[in-house]
Amino acid sequence: MNTENSFSQLYSELSLNPDLPTLAGRCMLLTEILLDCNAHPQTQPVCRCLGAYLEEVKSGLTESMRDFQIVEFEEDAEPPRQKAWLLEDTETKCDYCRAVNHVLLVSHFDRDMLPYLTGLLHEVAHSMAGDLITPAQPRMTIHLPARH
């Protein structure tokens, strides 16, 4: 199992087909764990797991955004240079996360660079998750007048 596509088979939670907010939450957690790693060998298992989750996020974004692709334009409208999706920035952030995770997984780099690479991955993953996780709605409180 040496391809990123086979990673998802290694993690039983992924077989439950979690939704995008759950996947994004796991990515945030894994990047927080990476921040505590201080040697390249420590990052390997976390990066493998993160890679599986990022692949699921990527495929989930692709699937969920398929309905939002722009397929026709008005005559005077300028067509987009690339695909125009509702969450295109989120998909780009996911791709950035996948790229930095790949560097952490396969590259040999100076030990001094580890905190910067994990920090970058953490920041982008949290930004991506912020796009996917909607904050809980505050409960509405109704104050009734006191009876005297």
Language model features by range: what are they?
Residues M1-H148:
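Sequence/structural signature of long amphipathic alpha-helices
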